C-alpha cells in the first residue's frame, strides 16, 4: 500500500471505477483498483473480538468481555487498553477496519443486542467508547462507531420505523456518538438498519450529512450495516459512502446509470470516493497486504488483560454479613447451569471462536484449596447442548468428520470433494468455499461416535438452514428435511430445533451421522434481504432428566455445605443478534432452583451471568449477589478472582435493573407494530424514568459495592466566566477527596451528577455528567478531579430553535460513589444561551 494523492486519484478514476469503489466485493472486503494502486481493504467484526473473515472454522481470536461488562468498569484507562489490544488482534487477522464499538442505547431490557452496547446513559457510553476508539486507532486500525442511530431492537430491524422526537434523539440516542467523537474522531461510522421518522438511516440526509458531517464536522467514511442499503440514488445522495457487503445490490450498473442521467451527480460520487480513499490513507501505515493471512496472538500479556477486564467488570450487588470473599481453604459446592458452561459472549456478530475459555467451575476449582463439589441444579439450554465435543472420530480424535459432496446421499456413486475435522457441531457456512463447489447447493455427511456415561433416554436435536437427518447407528432419529418450521437461530434464517429420542446404554459406542443439505434444499419460504449463502447446521443431545430431581439434589447438598455458590443466567442462545427476548426471566427452572437452594442455605452466593437485566424474584433472600455478564475468554477466572478476594470489586451497574418487565419505561412501546415503534418514553430512558416517577428499580444504575469502604469529602467547584457565545472553553472543575476507610485496597468510582433548575420544560431529576476511577490503599486519601464543559453539563435540545439550550439558573452538583453519601454544591448560569456543534 502507498499513500494516495486523493484529488489526483479522483481525477484519474473512470466512472466505472468510482462506482466499483462504493460497494464491497464480498462479505469483508472493499474493491481494488490496481492500476491506481488502490488496494482492497478488509473489515472484521467487531463488538467483543476480531473474528477475522470466517464464521465457519475460522482462526481463533481473543474474546473480550461484552460491552455491558466493560461499561460496568467505568474505567477509561482499561477501555483504552482494550482498544489497543483490539487493534493488535485486528492486525493479526489482516483487517484494516474493526466494525465496532456498538453504542446504541438499551431502552428496553429485552433488546437482543443490548449486551453489545456499554450503557443506558449516553455520557457513560460515549466517554468509554471514545477511549476505546482512541486506543484502537492508535494502533493504526480504523474504528467504526455503530449503529447510527436508534437501532435498539431486533424485531423487524431492517424495516421498523423508529418514531422518536428530535429532543430524545439528541439527548439520548445521538449523545454517545457525539461524546465519543469529542474524544476520538473515528475513521468510520456504520448506519443503522432501521428507519428514523420515516426514512431509512442509510438514506437519511439529515442524519448522515446535516448532523454527522456538517454540524459535527466529521469527515470519515460512512458504511451501511450488512445488507442495510435500500436504494441507489437516495443513499448515495444522502451521504452513504460504502454499501456492504458485496457483491452490490444497489450500485454497480444501476448507480452508473443514475449518474449518467443526473439522478446522482458525479461530484456527489467524488465525495463518496474521497471518503473511501481517505480511509485507505488512514490505514496505509499498517502495511497490511491484500488478502493477508490470518494469525492468532494469544500472548500471556493479552490473557492477563482479558482476565483483569473480566474481574473488574463483576458487580458486587449484595454482600450482607460479609459473606464474600470466600475462604480458599474451605470446601465449596458449585451449583448451576452456568457453572460448567463458558458463557463468554452473546450471539450473532459478537460470536467468535475464542482461543480458549474458562468456565466458572474451572475458575473456582483452580483457586480453591478445599474440596470442590458440583451439582447441576437445573439445565437451562434453549436448544440441546452441542454434541460435537462429546464425539470421537473413527481414528479416536475428539470431534467428528465433515465430508462434503456435490450430490445427495441418494446418489450411490457420489464423489467426496472435501473432508474436515471439526469439534463444534454448530456451523454457519456463509463463508465456506471449495473450488469444486460452484453453487450454494451441496451436501455434507457429519460422522462421529458417541459413548454415553449413563444409561437413559437421550434427546437429539437438529437445527438447520437447509435440511438435516440425524441417524444413530443407522436409525433415523431426527428428520428436519420436510414440513420445516421457521425459527430464530442463525440471524432468524434457521428452522426450529426438531427433536427425536433413543434409549442408550452407558459405555456402548454409537455411530452418529447428520446428513445435511445446504440452504437451497430447504422447503422454507426464505424471503428477506439477508441470505447467508449455503446456510448452516446445529446438532445436539442430552440425557433426559427430571428438573425436580436435579433441584432437590442441589438443595440437599447445599444444606450440608457451608460454602455454596450458584452460577445461573443466560448464554448466547438467549441473548443474540437476530431476535429480542420475550421476557426478562431466567431460563425455566432457574428461579425455583435458586430460591430452594437459598432456603436450604441462606449464605449461598448467587452469581448471575447475562448481558442485560433479568428478573430476580429471589433477590430478597440472597445475602451475596454478583452480576458477572458475559466475561470473555477469562470469564471463569475473572469471577473466581472476585469471589476469593484476589480482586476487590469496584464495578457499577451501567444499566438499571427493574423489579419486573412492566416497570421499565419502554414496556408499552417495544417491538414493531405494523412497521413502526414509538419511542414513547421520550428522554426518560433508564434511571431518568425511575427517578422522575419515583419508582425504585430492583438495583439502580450506578450501584455496586466493594470489600472495603470509602468516604468522600472536601467538595470544591470552579467555573470560568461566561462568554457571549456558549462553546468549549467554559469548564466546570469538580474536585473531591476520596478516602479508603476500610482494611482492603480497592478502587472507587466517583460519579458527577447535575440537577437542573426549574424551567418551562420537563427535565430529568438529575443526569450523569462525568466520572472517574481512583485506586486507594487502606487509609489512603487522594484528591480527584472531574472536568466537564458547561454546555454539556447544562443543555437540553430545544426543538423550536433546533439548537441546544443552556438556560439560566442555579444548577445543583451531586457527587456520589459507593454507599449512600452524597456531596452537594452548585453553580450559576447567568444567561440563557444556545449552541450547535460537537
Swiss-Prot record:
Positions of the catalytic residues: 225
Gene3D superfamilies the record matches: Galactose-binding domain-like, Glycoside hydrolase family 3 C-terminal domain, Glycoside hydrolase, family 3, N-terminal domain, Immunoglobulins
Gene Ontology molecular function terms on file: beta-glucosidase activity
Keywords: Carbohydrate metabolism, Cellulose degradation, Glycoprotein, Glycosidase, Hydrolase, Polysaccharide degradation, Secreted
Pathway assignment: Glycan metabolism; cellulose degradation
E.C. code: 3.2.1.21
A cellular component term, taken from the record's GO annotations: extracellular region
One GO BP annotation of this record: cellulose catabolic process
Enzyme class: hydrolase
Keyword Transmembrane helix (UniProt): no
Chief place of localization: secreted
Residue positions the entry lists as glycosylated: 197, 493
A Pfam family it matches: Fn3-like
SMART domains, alphabetized: Fn3_like, PA14
Top-rank lineage group of the source organism: Eukaryota
Cellular localisation: Secreted
Annotated catalysed reactions: Hydrolysis of terminal, non-reducing beta-D-glucosyl residues with release of beta-D-glucose
Start and end residues of each PA14 domain: 395-555
Known function: Beta-glucosidases are one of a number of cellulolytic enzymes involved in the degradation of cellulosic biomass. Catalyzes the last step releasing glucose from the inhibitory cellobiose.
Family the entry assigns: Belongs to the glycosyl hydrolase 3 family.
Protein name listed in UniProt: Probable beta-glucosidase I
Amino acid at each position: 500500500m502507498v499513500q494516495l494523492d486523493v484529488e489526483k486519484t479522483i481525477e484519474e478514476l473512470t466512472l466505472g471505477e468510482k462506482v466499483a469503489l462504493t460497494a464491497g466485493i464480498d462479505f469483508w472486503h472493499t474493491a481494488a483498483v490496481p492500476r491506481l494502486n488502490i488496494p482492497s481493504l478488509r473489515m472484521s467484526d467487531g463488538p467483543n473480538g476480531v473474528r477475522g473473515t470466517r464464521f465457519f472454522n475460522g482462526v481463533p481470536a481473543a474474546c473480550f468481555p461484552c460491552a455491558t461488562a466493560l461499561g460496568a468498569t467505568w474505567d477509561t484507562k482499561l477501555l483504552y487498553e482494550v482498544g489497543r489490544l483490539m487493534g493488535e488482534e485486528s492486525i493479526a487477522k489482516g483487517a484494516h477496519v474493526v466494525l465496532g464499538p456498538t453504542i446504541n442505547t438499551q431502552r428496553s431490557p429485552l433488546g437482543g443486542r443490548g449486551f453489545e452496547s456499554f450503557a443506558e446513559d449516553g455520557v457513560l457510553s460515549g466517554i468509554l467508547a471514545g477511549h476505546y476508539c482512541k486506543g484502537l486507532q492508535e494502533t493504526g486500525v480504523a474504528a467504526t462507531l455503530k449503529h447510527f442511530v436508534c437501532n435498539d431492537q431486533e424485531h423487524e430491524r431492517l424495516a421498523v420505523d423508529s418514531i422518536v422526537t428530535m429532543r430524545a434523539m439528541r439527548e439520548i440516542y445521538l449523545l454517545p456518538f457525539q461524546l465519543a467523537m469529542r474524544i476520538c474522531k473515528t475513521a468510520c461510522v456504520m448506519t443503522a438498519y432501521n428507519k428514523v421518522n420515516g426514512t431509512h438511516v442509510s438514506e437519511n440526509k439529515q442524519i448522515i450529512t446535516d448532523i454527522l458531517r456538517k454540524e459535527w464536522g466529521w469527515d470519515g467514511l460512512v458504511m451501511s450495516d450488512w445488507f442495510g442499503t435500500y436504494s441507489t440514488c437516495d443513499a448515495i445522495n444522502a451521504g452513504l459512502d460504502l454499501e456492504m457487503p458485496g457483491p452490490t445490490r444497489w450500485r454497480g450498473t444501476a448507480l452508473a446509470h443514475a449518474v449518467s442521467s443526473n439522478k446522482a451527480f458525479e461530484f456527489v460520487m467524488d465525495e463518496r470516493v474521497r471518503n473511501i480513499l481517505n480511509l485507505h490513507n488512514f490505514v496505509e501505515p499498517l502495511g497490511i497486504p491484500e488478502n493477508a493471512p490470518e494469525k492468532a496472538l494469544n500472548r500471556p500479556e493479552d490473557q492477563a488483560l482479558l482476565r483483569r477486564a473480566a474481574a473488574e467488570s463483576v458487580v458486587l450487588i449484595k454482600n450482607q454479613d460479609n459473606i464474600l470473599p470466600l475462604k480458599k481453604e474451605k470446601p465449596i459446592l458449585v451449583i448451576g447451569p452456568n457453572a460448567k458452561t463458558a458463557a463468554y459472549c452473546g450471539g450473532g456478530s459478537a460470536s467468535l471462536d475464542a482461543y480458549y475459555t474458562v468456565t466458572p467451575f474451572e475458575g473456582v476449582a483452580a483457586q480453591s484449596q478445599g474440596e470442590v463439589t458440583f451439582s447441576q441444579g437445573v439445565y437451562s439450554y434453549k436448544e440441546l447442548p452441542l454434541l460435537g465435543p462429546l464425539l470421537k472420530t473413527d481414528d479416536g480424535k475428539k470431534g467428528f468428520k465433515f465430508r462434503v459432496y456435490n450430490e445427495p446421499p441418494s446418489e450411490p456413486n457420489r464423489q467426496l470433494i472435501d473432508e474436515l475435522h471439526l469439534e463444534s457441531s454448530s456451523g454457519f457456512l456463509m463463508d465456506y468455499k471449495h473450488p469444486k463447489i460452484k453453487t450454494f447447493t451441496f451436501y455434507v455427511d457429519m460422522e462421529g461416535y458417541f459413548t454415553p456415561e449413563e444409561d437413559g433416554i437421550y434427546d437429539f436435536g437438529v437445527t438447520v438452514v437447509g435440511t438435516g437427518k440425524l441417524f444413530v447407528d443407522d436409525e433415523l432419529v431426527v428428520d428436519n428435511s420436510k414440513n420445516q418450521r421457521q425459527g430464530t437461530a442463525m440471524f432468524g434464517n434457521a428452522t426450529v430445533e426438531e427433536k427425536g429420542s433413543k434409549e442408550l446404554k452407558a459405555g456402548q459406542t454409537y455411530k452418529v451421522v447428520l446428513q445435511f443439505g445446504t440452504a437451497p434444499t430447504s422447503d422454507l419460504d426464505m424471503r428477506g434481504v439477508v441470505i447467508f449463502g449455503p446456510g448452516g447446521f446445529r446438532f445436539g443431545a442430552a440425557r433426559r432428566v427430571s428438573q425436580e430431581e436435579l433441584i432437590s439434589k442441589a438443595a440437599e447438598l447445599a444444606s450440608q455445605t457451608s460454602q455454596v455458590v450458584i452460577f445461573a443466567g443466560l448464554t448466547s442462545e438467549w441473548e443474540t443478534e437476530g431476535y429480542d427476548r420475550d421476557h426478562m426471566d431466567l431460563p425455566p427452572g432457574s428461579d425455583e432452583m435458586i430460591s430452594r437452594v437459598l432456603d436450604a442455605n441462606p449464605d449461598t452466593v448467587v452469581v448471575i451471568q447475562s448481558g442485560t437485566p433479568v428478573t430476580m424474584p429471589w433477590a430478597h433472600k440472597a445475602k451475596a449477589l454478583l452480576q458477572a455478564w458475559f466475561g470473555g475468554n477469562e470469564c471463569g477466572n475473572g469471577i473466581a478472582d472476585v469471589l476469593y478476594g484476589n480482586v476487590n470489586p469496584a464495578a457499577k451497574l451501567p444499566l438499571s435493573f427493574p423489579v419486573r418487565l412492566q416497570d421499565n419505561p419502554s414496556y408499552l412501546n417495544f417491538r414493531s407494530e405494523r412497521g413502526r415503534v414509538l419511542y414513547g418514553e421520550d428522554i426518560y430512558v433508564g434511571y431518568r424514568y425511575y427517578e422522575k416517577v419515583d419508582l425504585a428499580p430492583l438495583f439502580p444504575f450506578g450501584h455496586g459495592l466493594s470489600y472495603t469502604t470509602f468516604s468522600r469529602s472536601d467538595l470544591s467547584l470552579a467555573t470560568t466566566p461566561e462568554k457571549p457565545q456558549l462553546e468549549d472553553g467554559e469548564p466546570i472543575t469538580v474536585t473531591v477527596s476520596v478516602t479508603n476507610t476500610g482494611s482492603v485496597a480497592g478502587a472507587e468510582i466517583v460519579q458527577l451528577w447535575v440537577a437542573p433548575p426549574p424551567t418551562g420544560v420537563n427535565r430529568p431529576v438529575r443526569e450523569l455528567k462525568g466520572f472517574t476511577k481512583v485506586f486507594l490503599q487502606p487509609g489512603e486519601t487522594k484528591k480527584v478531579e472531574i472536568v466537564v464543559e458547561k454546555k454539556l453539563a447544562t443543555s437540553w435540545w430545544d426543538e423550536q430553535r433546533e439548537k441546544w439550550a443552556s438556560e439560566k439558573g442555579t444548577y445543583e452538583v451531586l457527587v456520589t460513589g459507593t454507599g449512600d453519601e452524597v456531596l452537594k454544591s452548585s453553580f450559576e448560569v447567568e444567561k440563557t444561551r444556545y449552541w450547535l456543534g460537537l
